[in-house]
């Protein structure tokens, strides 16, 4: 039972099929029907820097529960490491908690550094960092590596749930 609770708490990412092809956080803001979560105050420059840094981590091994270049990354560990390293923010460690963080944005409003969420239900099971030009960086599955993928790829387009801006 304790093991189940620990696994749910870490909640990195679901295993996805292979494909070829803080402390600085502000308070909660209300009044927009749940579209605004914890606002961080990350500047666009810092968010872009985080996206560039994320691209540099492509090829790092996937490892469930890991969050450093030396140990590898799961999806939430990758996002947390990128934002901690480039902005000093301590982000939530689970995809479900990240899904409540920042401000909801529409797909046509995406900017480098925004977070993208995927899943088949209301709660996301996977997330990545948008880097521009329709692409995102993520740590997708056991046995894989951090990679750059297109949001428009059939697999990802079918699962897109939400976009959030730090």
Model segments located where?
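C-terminal motif of bacterial Sec signal peptides marking the signal peptidase cleavage site
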Residues: 8-12
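Structural motif
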Residues: 113-114, 134
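Catalytic cysteine-centered active-site loop
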Residues: 37-40, 60-112
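Bacterial N-terminal signal peptides that target proteins for export
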Residues: 1-2
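Stable alpha-helical elements in mature extracytoplasmic
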Residues: 46-50, 54, 74-75, 79
